[in-house]
UniProtKB/Swiss-Prot annotation:
Its cofactor is Zn(2+). 5-methyltetrahydropteroyltri-L-glutamate binds at residues 16-19, 115, 519-520, 565, 609. The lineage of its organism: Bacteria, Pseudomonadati, Pseudomonadota, Betaproteobacteria, Burkholderiales. Catalyzes the transfer of a methyl group from 5-methyltetrahydrofolate to homocysteine resulting in methionine formation. The gene is metE. CDD domains: CIMS_C_terminal_like, CIMS_N_terminal_like. This is 5-methyltetrahydropteroyltriglutamate--homocysteine methyltransferase. Signal peptide: none annotated. Transmembrane segments: none annotated. GO terms for biological process: methionine biosynthetic process; methylation.
Length: 764
């Protein structure tokens, strides 16, 4: 019979139990009692998740997908590969040691963190040097196998593969090539796999998502020898690829001496034919046809039609699965009491997706009639989504269709706009500002909670937030900032806030997914055509502007970031949805301008995150992403100044696209790199104004004026004074007011010092 399985289950718990247990553990100083409570929580979550898989009818439960903080870090712990600078004993690694690597300690900073491929999950970046060694590590995976077997489950273990583990790391201390470490890493994996076989594990899923990338030849060539060394003495190995089409590697993957392969049919449906053709008789093929990265209910009839001919060819060698781990999906739709029945009928969270996988397996094995109820309900939902007036708004579709190239262009080029803006605002050289948000204080959180619970009425909430705006304006005036912001006290999240106010978005109560460690995010759902029924931010910006004669920036989240940080409808191209959001934001910019707001910031921190994994797909993405931003921001007059903000660890490869946004001012995150990120501007002359961050807001440390002055002077080596702004790296939402007060006062002081030396060079 065809096997049904998933690649992984969310680890945080249906009520974010892991998040709260972790935070209690850290808050209690990693005491013995706190550690016992954390370990008990982890054990209970694993048991619940395995039972969910069993109740759904899956043929095995996935073990090894659980991690206390991050699965890449946990894999390093399994193979004794944590950074040497921490000095940990790999075999005696404690939870406190593990978290020290993730979060830093008194002696060492935390490991670097970055995005897991093109998802919104963050992994901890391995550190490799010529001295790196691997070997036996923690016993956690074997403990989990024993737990699963004791509960009567059939475990399939899951591990990040050796090639991916090396690829994801960074070379340090003169290591020329991470592949040099593969001969050291393979024996550690081989020993781990041999022990899993001894523990009674029949199958091990080895995740190698790097095959979805434009993989260099040396890495491709290393795959077969590595797996030839791994297979002897190991359980059956299922090499799992996901996140994109891997058909260019089909011959290589089919030639690997493993027992099976997994392919992602959601991100690469066309690749199926390349794998089924001449598929080896000794391998299973796991087809990931239930979307592990989105929230929409599977069209089971459509999936069955896609799988049926494959089943005829492969028989029981066809496995049914999710496209990738369900780590990226919310846990359970049953915990969404506020979503209406119509919308809920279109959705499937992780628990529901396990059932979809099993239903497809049963339909192939027993016929559709055996699971008619599940299939009929899915068919009704699919039909409703295709025709619902709630999803399809003819007015929005007409507006998108009517867009022209002129709508994506400002009336004048930057030089003319800059002259008009200088005349309007009369700012000094090196103008100072912030990125947007100020501290979300306990008072703000209490007022928001009281309002949501009905304890505080709407008028009381507005008054409480207005008081916070007044505080923010008064503080900025006391610092001496040149351009102010209202502080965003009323916003719980830079995407959810706008999603609550636009038609076509829905907000969940409990649709949390893990971002990293204990941090969870609750992405909005973009279920239909996006429309703005009324202004969203004009009241707040206008009130703030009424408190000062200095310019106050209106603050918006850009269309691409709204898209990237949401669960997006899958029934039309993402580019179309981006344009719909852009049109809504365009209306908001015009409303802000009409209300007298002369500077409007449209943030796009996720522009680079949306880059496709393969280079061949990137130009198309950047074309529509840039167009969406320009649609949002180009309707205003020449003397209205458009700002944008981006936080990247690197952006040199997309600088032409950033310039093509044609924002009057861009602010970027540069402090941690000591302005090295500005090196890209030595070969590409950015034409408009720029504010490289001079204050690292991610650290509680407060810089002094001398330190900030040094950074401003470094920036002036690359950016002309007449186009340079002075600002922090990012928003100040997570900082405390005492830190903000000291840092911004120092920033203004430093800017004034440097201003005296450049004033003569800046045109009036």
């Amino acid at each position: 019979m065809t096997t049904a399985h998933i690649l992984g289950f969310p680890r945080i718990g249906a009520q974010r139990e892991l998040k709260f247990a972790l935070e209690r553990y850290w808050r209690d100083g990693a005491s013995a009692d706190a550690e016992r409570a954390l370990v008990d929580t982890g054990r209970a979550l694993r048991a619940a998740h395995w039972q969910t898989q069993r109740d759904a009818g899956l043929d095995c439960v996935t073990v090894g997908d659980f991690a206390w903080y991050d699965h890449v870090l946990t894999t390093l712990a399994h193979v004794g590969g944590l950074p040497r600078r921490f000095g940990f004993d790999a075999r005696a690694l404690t939870l406190a040691d593990y978290f020290a690597a993730a979060r830093g300690n008194a002696a060492q900073p935390a490991m670097e963190m970055t995005k897991w491929f093109d998802t919104n999950y963050h992994y901890l970046v391995p550190e490799y040097s010529p001295a790196t060694t691997f070997g036996p590590g923690v016993e956690w995976l074997f403990d989990e196998v024993r737990e699963a077997r004791a509960l009567g489950h059939r475990p399939k273990a899951a591990l990040v593969g050796p090639l991916t583990l090396l690829w994801l790391g960074k070379a340090r201390d003169g290591l020329a090539d991470r592949l040099e470490l593969l001969p050291r890493l393979v024996p550690a994996y081989r020993a781990l796999l041999a022990r899993l076989r001894e523990a009674g594990v029949d199958w091990v899923q080895i995740d190698e998502p790097i095959f979805a990338l434009d993989l260099p030849a040396a890495w491709r060539d290393a795959a077969r020898p590595a797996y030839e060394a791994l297979v002897p003495g190991a359980p059956k190995l299922l090499v799992a690829t996901y996140f994109d089409d891997v058909s260019e590697h089909a011959a290589l993957l089919k030639a690997l001496p493993v027992a099976g392969l997994h392919v992602d049919l959601v991100r690469g449906d066309a690749q199926l034919d390349a794998f089924v053709a001449d598929y080896p008789a000794d391998k299973v093929l796991s087809c990931g046809i239930v979307d592990g990265r989105n929230v929409w209910r599977n069209d089971l009839d459509r999936s069955l039609a896609r799988l049926a001919p494959v089943h005829e060819t492969l028989g029981e060698r066809l496995w049914i699965a999710t496209s990738c781990s369900l780590l990226h999906a919310p846990v359970d739709l049953a915990h969404e009491p506020k979503l209406d029945d119509e919308l809920k009928a279109w959705l499937a969270f992780a628990v529901q997706k396990t059932r979809e996988v099993a239903a497809l397996r049963d339909a192939l094995a027993k016929g559709r009639a055996a699971v008619a109820a599940e299939f009929d309900a899915a068919a009704v939902a699919a039909a409703a989504r295709r025709t619902s007036a709630r999803i399809h708004n003819p007015l929005v579709k007409r507006r998108v269709a009517a867009l022209t190239d002129a709508d994506a262009r400002r009336a004048s080029a930057y030089p003319a706009r800059a002259a008009a803006q200088r005349a309007r605002f009369d700012l000094p050289p090196l103008p100072t500002t912030t990125i947007g948000s100020f501290p979300q204080t306990p008072e703000i959180r209490r007022a928001r909670a009281a309002f949501r619970q009905g304890v505080l009425d709407h008028l009381g909430y507005l008054e409480a937030m207005r008081e916070q705006v007044r505080i923010a304006i008064d503080k900025q005036l006391s610092y001496g900032l040149d351009v102010l912001v209202h502080g965003e006290a009323e916003r719980n999240d830079m995407v959810e806030y706008f999603g609550e106010l636009m038609w076509g978005f829905a907000i969940t109560s409990n649709g949390w997914v893990q971002s990293y460690g204990s941090r969870c995010v609750k992405p909005p759902l973009v279920y239909g055509d996006v429309y703005l029924p009324e202004p969203m931010t004009v009241g707040w910006a206008s009130y703030a502007q009424s408190l000062t004669t200095k310019p106050v920036k209106g603050m918006l989240t850009g269309p691409v970031t709204m898209l990237q940080w949401s669960f997006v409808r899958d029934d039309q191209p993402r580019a179309t949805t981006a344009l719909q959001i852009a049109l809504a934001l365009r209306q908001e910019t015009l409303d802000l301008e009409k209300a007298g707001i002369g500077m409007i910031q449209v943030d796009e921190p996720a522009l680079r995150e949306g880059l496709p994994l393969k280079a061949r797909d990137r130009a198309e993405y950047l074309d529509w992403a840039v167009r969406a931003f320009r649609i949002a921001a180009s309707g205003v007059a020449d003397d209205t100044q458009i700002h944008t903000h981006m936080c990247y660890s690197e952006f040199g490869d997309i600088l032409p696209s950033i310039a093509a946004l044609d924002a009057d001012v861009i602010s970027i995150e540069t402090t941690r790199s000591n302005m090295e990120l500005l090196d890209a501007f030595e070969t590409f002359e950015y034409p408009n104004e720029i504010g490289p961050g001079v204050y690292d807001i991610h650290s509680p440390r407060v810089p002094d004026a001398d330190e900030i002055e040094r950074l401003i002077l470094l920036a002036l080596e690359r950016i002309p004074a007449q186009r340079l702004w002075v600002n922090p790296d990012c928003g100040l939402k997570t900082r405390e007011w005492r830190q903000v007060d000291a840092a911004l006062a120092a920033m203004v002081d430093a800017a004034k010092r440097v201003r005296q030396t450049v004033e003569q060079a800046v045109p009036a």
